[in-house]
Amino acid sequence: MTVTVAEFEIADSPDAWTRAGFTVDGDPVCRVGGARIRLVGRERGSGIVGWSLRGLPKSAGSADVDGIPTTHSAADPAQPASHANGATAIDHVVLMSPDLDRTVASLAAIGVAPRRERDAELGGRPIRQIFFRFGEVIVEVVGSPETASEGPSTLWGITYVVADIDATASFFGEHAGPVKDAVQRGRRITTLRHRDLGMSVRTAMISAIPER
């Protein structure tokens, strides 16, 4: 069975996400594409504090995934909501790893294999990006190709697909950076100044994959 993302838990208030143009249900849950984002409040800390996954093997038990709090889910995919900021789906989530080999092994243990990898630089230091597909969501694992350290992996940021990147940038105004070409050919991206909006998760918006 394919492992897919059912839900992210994020330690933010619903008001912050409403200000950012997301539609938030009463639970409070934000439905983006087939995934749910449950806003659990700052009492739980900050950032992405856990996730729920469908299709986990029974052998996974109740263990976390490389230190990330993980819950088994049997919930059906969410019915997508309409959002004023133009978000239509989650493109990818960034998972920061202190030990790439360990993280890849942890994901293999739940039945997820890498699709591709890419070497790059971040702040002048070499990094390796390893990409995994969890249904409609890509998980981009990022870490050093040269060193490994102790500690858990963390879910670091989310990039959303939007219907019209220029309209989205206009919606956010000064709260978004300039629209620029993305690494993926034919796509464009803008990064939010998320803290200005009261959000604790690093957030970007990207145009859809061009039709061929």
Whereabouts are the PLM-identified features?
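Beta-rich nucleic-acid/ligand-interaction surfaces
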Residues: 120-131
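Glyoxalase I/VOC metalloenzyme domain signal
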Residues: 1-115, 133-212
